[in-house]
């Protein structure tokens, strides 16, 4: 068993890390601008156009080389096909992924416009490559060849199978005219998806304000100052609210009058026919694309290479969860009904009143207050400055995986806003293994799409690139500028040199001022640990191949490391190792931690049931067939009536705000699926039966066991380091071990049922 010294607060001194996040940083010294993210081509917005041309030129050369490999007189050229396909993927994704970041976070519209253009051009180009028979035939020839004395490695075979699946999902075996349909439908889906996401990120349309008549009456219970601050059409007229605004949210949560809450809810969720049209057209385009590929539904297409494999398996998983959780969710609703009954003075019926969608937040707030001795709890935010949380994260990761964060000053021009911080991720040997840019703080005009993890560059081995055979003449890129290529760096325990991963985390955590740091609430803390789980997967999952590096794995596996991180932050023993008051340095009182954790669990069944409903909705939308009509609002309302515990609301269309319908099309169940697996791994590797007093207080032994290197190394070696380079079912089975591990490693229907039982437990 690997053991580290006993955890002490002194050992967890924050050093330079906390000030890096808790104090305003001085501007970098005047100097010629550095390229964005220290990537040489990214010197200015107008550098993206020549970079795009350079990328296409290089990609064309690689395509020609790969397609010619089967006829090449040297068998070694065929042996290089998997490597060259991975290089081709890296050449394109290195620019596409960077543009995805820039178009979402950069405040300069010139950068955004240039990134949008490059993104569209290269995504369309990639869609065409996915139907290239030359590439596909070369890959088939490669995997069919035995290569005596030098067979394809398991990693190469995994990468090859990933590419083959991508080609076949793109209809590579279809006639040329049908393949052209694939490209057209894919481009349409890309365009519609971007529009849908922009609508979802923008929130409800503000074209028609919400009107609250007689606000002095309907808004009783809210402060007179708040009511007086609301704009009106005319003096003594109705108050006007922007749908989805913070004022609307305040009324939905705190207004005692049900009619006021109803008006705000319907106004914020009202059906927008243009947005509904975009969503339904996108879903129909996906159904058409599935038909082109010879599949019944888009869910069949999307799940073919996922752990769940089929829509039937997903529906079985979700239906069993819904059946199990519905009574508990109904019990949560009954608790809210009782509170509503107490506040409904004119009630004459003995039946409990219905809790509507506009009641949920209001009575949930009252329910939470009813659990507290004096109706409230002291805030925990002073104990969690961003710097304190980052220091705790770094020390936790050091104990588990032997990696830590090193704060680094950025050069002028390296980041898109002065509030962005850079961390170098270091191994135990003092070697940098990657870079994380942290765009964590609020700023005017910052997109409010929530927290996100962007992979700007994946890791891969680069010293063995056979670039001399690409067929590009000397000086071919002289007029196009620099590319994304790197020389690579040596990593401890790995042969060769690797390009290091670069990731970006974005959140909206308030601002850092001279007067004090940004402080995190409980949800913020969970968000930070969750997103850092993705980043650490990228840092540790450094494989030889770009296409299976880090988070490039099955969608229903990728959330596992992040959800596991949430378990650590929910452990009082772990929190007690770093949570200190930002002014007094006093430790967070354990009873206060426990009270907040208990509060966080209130109405949890209702929240879980809501997630199940959303996952079922995602499946239903992506189970429509070619030519089938779709009324997305009717489908959502019927699902709420049949499976939900709160009735639907006429005239609303919440589904247009469900942005994950694009990015997670038919795979939104992944959050629940990975939550089941993460819970099992947590109890098997880290909690190890610690459910008694030692786990619930600051007993150092509890923290030492939870943060044991033994558990961390097991998860690192059996899961994280592989990225997507190994069958995820085998990884889960390996880390669980025993009879259950053997069963789940098979990845069949019984394995799916077993994961479902883990969730129900």
From Swiss-Prot:
A Pfam match: Peptidase_M3
Binding, Zn(2+): 530, 534, 537
Active site: 531
Predominant location category: mitochondrion
GO annotation, cellular component aspect: mitochondrial matrix; mitochondrion
Keywords: Hydrolase, Metal-binding, Metalloprotease, Mitochondrion, Protease, Transit peptide, Zinc
Listed SUPFAM superfamilies: Metalloproteases ('zincins'), catalytic domain
One of the GO biological process terms: peptide metabolic process
Annotated EC: 3.4.24.59
Localization (cell): Mitochondrion matrix
InterPro entries reported in the protein's UniProt record: M3A_MIP, MetalloPept_cat_dom_sf, Neurolysin/TOP_dom2, Pept_M3A_M3B, Pept_M3A_M3B_dom
Catalyses which reaction(s): Release of an N-terminal octapeptide as second stage of processing of some proteins imported into the mitochondrion
GO molecular function annotations of the record: metal ion binding; metalloendopeptidase activity
Cofactor(s) it depends on: Zn(2+)
Free-text cofactor note: Binds 1 zinc ion.
Keyword Protease included in the entry's annotation: yes
Family affiliation: Belongs to the peptidase M3 family.
Function: Cleaves proteins, imported into the mitochondrion, to their mature size. While most mitochondrial precursor proteins are processed to the mature form in one step by mitochondrial processing peptidase (MPP), the sequential cleavage by MIP of an octapeptide after initial processing by MPP is a required step for a subgroup of nuclear-encoded precursor proteins destined for the matrix or the inner membrane.
Protein name per its UniProtKB record: Mitochondrial intermediate peptidase 1
The species this protein was found in: Cryptococcus neoformans var. neoformans serotype D (strain JEC21 / ATCC MYA-565) (Filobasidiella neoformans)
Source organism phylogeny: Eukaryota, Fungi, Dikarya, Basidiomycota, Agaricomycotina
